[in-house]
């Protein structure tokens, strides 16, 4: 429920990014799981396409990051994730790899 309360804040950030980032620069957005990726894709329609970390039929509970995922996080301007309760595999990488996001 607390994540739903964050939704207006997320929309505001996305809106500000479209104003701040130059028109020809692509915003690099990463979503952790498919439901979040679907929502972010809808919001970014016409602006860009977010990358997805946990794809296919993988479970976020026992997921292990690959080097390609670490690169996604490192290059991201904005990262959407549920939190450490569901995606504990992202907690440390977000603190160390994705400092600019």
Feature map (PLM): residue ranges:
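Extracytoplasmic metal-acquisition and chelation regions
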Residues: 2, 8, 24-101
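Bacterial N-terminal signal peptides
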Residues: 8-19
């Amino acid at each position: 429920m607390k994540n739903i309360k964050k939704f207006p804040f997320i929309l505001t950030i996305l809106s500000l990014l479209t104003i701040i980032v130059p028109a020809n620069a692509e915003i690099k957005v990463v979503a952790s799981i498919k439901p979040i990726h679907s929502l972010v894709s809808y919001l970014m329609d016409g602006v860009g396409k977010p990358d997805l970390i946990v794809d296919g039929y993988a479970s976020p509970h026992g997921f292990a990051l690959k080097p390609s995922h670490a690169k996604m996080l490192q290059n991201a301007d904005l990262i959407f994730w549920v939190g450490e309760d569901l995606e504990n595999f992202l907690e440390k990488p977000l603190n160390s790899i994705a400092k600019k996001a």
